[in-house]
Amino acid sequence: MKKVLALVVAAAMGLSSAAFAAETATTPAPTATTTKAAPAKTTHHKKQHKAAPAQKAQAAKKHHKNAKTEQKAPEQKAQAAKKHAKKHSHQQPAKPAAQPAA
């Protein structure tokens, strides 16, 4: 922590790196009597790459439509016919005029 503080102070004051190195060289080095164990072997995990999906248009990505059911488009109607649903009146077709017997 003190080294970091000294580095920040030295950088702020604009001291040369040689003067800073001389200052930090006076700190006692740790003793070499301690033995360190070899670091554990690191295993690198490989990512499994997925197959890239087929490219689609932007609208096809957003709107998922069911391709299985192909529905027929309804017949186009006039605007008034869409708004006003007519009730079916039960009219029988007109009978032909009775012909006199000859």
UniProtKB/Swiss-Prot annotation:
Its main location: periplasm. Residues 22-58 form a propeptide. Disulfide bonds: none annotated. Pfam families: Asr. It is found in: Periplasm. Residues 22-41, 91-102 have a biased composition (Low complexity). Proteolytic processing gives rise to the active protein. Belongs to the Asr family. Required for growth and/or survival at acidic conditions. This is Acid shock protein. The gene is asr.
